[in-house]
């Protein structure tokens, strides 16, 4: 959030998890993987832990390290005579969709996945981004499905496809979260872990009440593009490193119209509860800002384009 004073916050954003299981793939590449989990540790479909809807790693130390690295890269580009005018300004992102299931739960129809892609395209099209469903694969693995957050490394090492420019989406039960994502700067160190994980029931018309319009994926992909939560840093100076998102002291839940947690002349504007990077209901969020768009372009240019 860019206003005037937004502290480097502490919430966690790391990798996005959801369970997307495609039953049928029409006209697209599709493969099937069958893995057997040694034990079936079934977790209840809890979607939050306290007030943590998103499991992406946004601890202050993580954010500070990422911003330091970003500053170095920007300095390097400046030395080469490159400016923001030469950043990528949108494009087509190929999507590799990995549907996980325990053999009974997590099954997604092709139409479910197609609906999710439409939601993403509607959200990002105003900013020049489009998502192309490159392939769908299905994996039967009890352990991975029931807790893809804890089993992330094994799952992703087996299923990840593409390059830094390509988006891997995993649908499953991501521990206690609705979803989580990696940030662009982590690709260089751990390319195989790059991607977004979402709760399988958060897709459009899924069973996750108030979070079943597909915007868990929209939110987590925002992280994949390099965005932070709108409430990152609270009412302090740097906030979410975006100039046109009003400062917000803490995450907003449900749809609290008129909420204003950072008050005074230094903090114009109400809390951005309608922003995709807050924690409100899917029905409440519907936009990114021009500043967020500029950051997405910059981060894609620095960390994903041509990688």
Where are these regions (language model features)?
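Short glycine/proline-enriched loop/turn "hinge" motifs that connect secondary-structure elements
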Residues: 85-90, 188-190, 267-270
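Positively charged n-region of N-terminal signal peptides that target proteins for export
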Residues: 1-5
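Second-shell loop/turn segments in exported
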Residues: 100-109, 206-211, 283-284
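Metzincin-family zinc-dependent endopeptidase catalytic domain
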Residues: 114-254, 258-259
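Solvent-exposed, acidic/flexible segments
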Residues: 106-113, 210-215, 270, 289, ...
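Hydrophobic alpha-helical membrane-insertion segments, chiefly the h-region
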Residues: 11-22
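Propeptide-to-catalytic entry region of secreted or membrane-anchored zinc metalloproteases
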Residues: 25-167, 171-175, 301-306
């Amino acid at each position: 959030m860019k206003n005037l004073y937004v502290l480097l916050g502490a919430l966690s954003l790391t990798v996005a998890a959801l369970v997307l299981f495609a039953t049928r793939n029409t006209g697209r590449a599709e493969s099937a993987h069958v893995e057997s989990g040694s034990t079936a540790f079934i977790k209840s479909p809890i979607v939050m832990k306290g007030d943590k809807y998103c499991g992406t790693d946004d601890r202050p130390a993580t954010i500070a390290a990422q911003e330091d690295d970003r500053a170095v890269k920007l300095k390097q580009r400046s030395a080469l005579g490159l400016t923001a005018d030469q950043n990528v300004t949108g494009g087509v992102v190929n999507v590799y969709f990995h549907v996980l299931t325990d053999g009974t739960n997590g099954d997604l129809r092709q139409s479910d996945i197609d609906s999710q892609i439409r939601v993403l395209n509607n959200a990002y099209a105003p900013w020049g981004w489009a998502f192309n469903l490159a392939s769908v694969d299905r994996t039967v693995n009890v352990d991975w499905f029931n807790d893809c957050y804890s089993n992330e490394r094994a799952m992703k090492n087996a299923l990840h496809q593409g390059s830094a420019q390509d988006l891997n989406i995993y649908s499953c039960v991501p521990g206690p979260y609705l979803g989580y994502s990696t940030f662009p700067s982590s690709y260089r160190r751990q390319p195989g872990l790059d991607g977004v994980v979402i709760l399988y029931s958060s897709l459009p018309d899924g069973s996750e009440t108030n979070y079943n319009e597909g915007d868990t994926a929209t939110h987590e992909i925002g992280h994949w593009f390099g965005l932070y939560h709108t409430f990152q840093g609270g009412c302090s100076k740097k906030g979410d490193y975006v100039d046109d998102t009003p400062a917000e002291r803490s995450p907003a839940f449900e749809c609290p119209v008129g909420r204003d947690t950072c008050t005074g002349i230094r903090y114009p504007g109400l809390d951005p509860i309608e922003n995709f990077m807050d924690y409100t209901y899917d029905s409440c969020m519907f936009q990114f800002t021009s500043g967020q768009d500029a950051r997405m372009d910059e981060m894609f240019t620095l960390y994903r384009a041509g990688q």
